[in-house]
């Protein structure tokens, strides 16, 4: 390995160390004292509950851990959006799990909490996975009620989804382990089965204080909406237990008795490890995002090897449209179609030198055709993003780059097979769209620590914004010195760089998680396993395409 490989490896490992540090910080929720208070009430933390619930010999993939990262700081922050969530196995069955974190503002819902819960319900609906709610929440965070309560994608959408999932036959189980108040009280009741822990679990539309204020009635928490009340008087809950462990054990039993569903039938054979060492991924990705590299080196370390020891990647139109690599492969045994941005400089058969990471007419045309082929064959698609955008200039415009780009976007948008997106490096502008960014409904979307997501590259954006700002100042008659201009540029670049980081994207749930590159195989395999649980694949139609 050369010096540059070692440098890249050092930078990536440093990034991963920082990632683990941040994840540990998030795992503390509302802090040590809040956790101790939870334990004093014989209550587990959300991560302890999930650990107790899930099969220990199978992976639990946490999603949305960075939701709310560096947001709501005026309110003390909202680690993980006040909700711990992900996909795990319960009694051998893959499930979506959502657990309120009572240590974070009593489990109150911030705007990002609603967005995260809706994302988890979306995953359950798209993949027909059972969903388990571990409820312990004080309801809407009142200081921000205007941003969480009334709109289409706000708090009320949760209960609409409860009803829709029930109609779709998706199992929903709610274990009420703490408070469940106001509008949130509808969630367990709209689930298939509701379990409560005596002494801690409570469900009511209005708590004792509000009841006193509204109608003058004095009543305690347990009598108003405790486990005994709802299992013996109202009939709202189905089971009551003395401890959380007993309650969660019953959840396991319920899930264990579910009928095994039909699947989509995506092809899978015995898995073989990659043909090249997967940990070498750390040294392949340049520490400088503008530098070229060969995307095949990434793919060969993610996909399975064949029996002959070589990579299972079979390139489609290998010598045409070289700035996008398309091909069929096996990944943990699954048959997949891969669409990946080639980052090295290539030469077309017409003699044109093409920049890596840029989508040209021929590569857009090739990718569109390949995506259509995968839909025809019902093969899941994996997008590996490191894209700076579409080629610009008169040569591309006259050749119809907009037409070819639109054809690729059309194919991605109308694709009916599951799409899984991994943001490896750059993800800029329309390139993000064409390579199945968040707006194009990937079943799952993950980012490496090296990812950058923005409308354009940092230097380009900063210089453009600087020109606008300086022009505005000059229009007002203000003279701008070179030193002032440089200070403005540095400030703009700093702000823009923060907004392009994977942490910013994960905080806003533009990606489901930031992952270690070595985990890429596992998360893609688990994503396809989840997608395979939905047997329904719609008919593939593209509508009007300009050719």
Predicted regions and their residues:
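Ligand-binding clefts of soluble mixed alpha/beta catalytic domains
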Residues: 1-547
């Amino acid at each position: 390995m050369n010096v540059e490989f070692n440098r890249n490896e050092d930078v990536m490992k440093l990034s991963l160390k920082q990632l683990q540090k941040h994840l540990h910080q998030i795992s503390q929720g509302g802090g040590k004292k809040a956790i101790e208070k939870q334990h004093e009430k014989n209550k587990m933390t959300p991560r302890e509950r999930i650990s107790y619930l899930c099969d220990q010999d199978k992976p639990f993939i946490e999603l949305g851990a960075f939701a709310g990262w560096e947001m709501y700081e005026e309110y003390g922050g909202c680690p993980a959006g006040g909700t711990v969530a992900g996909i795990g196995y319960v009694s051998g069955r893959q499930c979506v799990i959502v657990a309120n974190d009572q240590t974070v503002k009593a489990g109150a819902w911030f705007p990002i909490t609603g967005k995260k819960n809706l994302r988890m319900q979306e995953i359950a609906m798209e993949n027909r996975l059972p969903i388990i709610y571990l409820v312990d929440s004080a309801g809407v965070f009142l200081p921000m009620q205007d941003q969480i309560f009334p709109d289409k994608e706000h708090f009320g959408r949760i209960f609409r989804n409860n009803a829709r999932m029930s109609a779709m036959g998706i199992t929903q189980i709610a274990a009420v382990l703490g408070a469940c108040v106001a509008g949130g009280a509808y969630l367990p009741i709209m689930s298939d089965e509701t379990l409560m822990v005596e002494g801690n679990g409570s469900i009511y539309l209005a708590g004792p204080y509000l009841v006193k204020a509204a109608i003058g009635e004095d009543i305690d928490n347990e009598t108003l909406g405790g486990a005994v009340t709802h299992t013996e008087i109202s009939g709202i809950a189905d089971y009551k237990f003395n401890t959380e462990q007993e309650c969660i054990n019953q959840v396991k039993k319920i899930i264990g008795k579910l009928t095994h569903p039909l699947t989509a039938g995506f092809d899978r054979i015995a898995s073989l490890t990659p043909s090249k060492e997967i940990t070498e991924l750390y040294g392949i990705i340049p520490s400088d995002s503008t530098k070229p590299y060969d995307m095949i080196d990434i793919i060969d370390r993610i996909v399975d090897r064949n029996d002959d020891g070589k990579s299972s990647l079979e390139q489609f139109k290998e010598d045409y449209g070289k700035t996008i690599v398309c091909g069929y492969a096996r990944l943990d045994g699954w048959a997949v179609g891969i669409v990946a941005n080639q980052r090295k400089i290539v030469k077309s058969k017409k003699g044109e030198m093409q920049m890596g990471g840029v989508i040209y007419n021929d590569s857009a045309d090739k990718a569109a055709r390949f995506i259509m082929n995968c839909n025809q064959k019902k093969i899941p698609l994996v997008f590996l993003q490191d894209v700076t955008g579409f080629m610009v200039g008169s040569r591309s415009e006259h050749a119809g780059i907009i037409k070819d780009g639109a054809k690729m976007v059309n194919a991605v948008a109308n694709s009916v097979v599951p799409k899984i997106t991994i943001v490896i490096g750059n993800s800029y502008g329309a390139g993000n769209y064409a390579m199945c960014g968040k707006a194009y409904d990937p079943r799952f979307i993950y980012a490496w620590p090296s990812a950058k997501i923005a409308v354009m590259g940092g230097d380009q954006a900063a210089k453009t914004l600087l020109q606008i700002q300086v022009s505005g100042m000059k229009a007002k008659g203000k003279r701008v010195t070179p030193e002032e201009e440089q200070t403005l540029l540095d400030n703009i670049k700093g702000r823009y760089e923060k907004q392009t980081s994977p942490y910013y994207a994960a905080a806003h749930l533009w990606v489901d998680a930031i992952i270690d590159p070595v985990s890429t195989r596992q998360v893609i395999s688990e994503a396809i396993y989840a997608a395979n649980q939905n047997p329904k694949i719609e008919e593939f139609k593209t509508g009007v395409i300009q050719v």
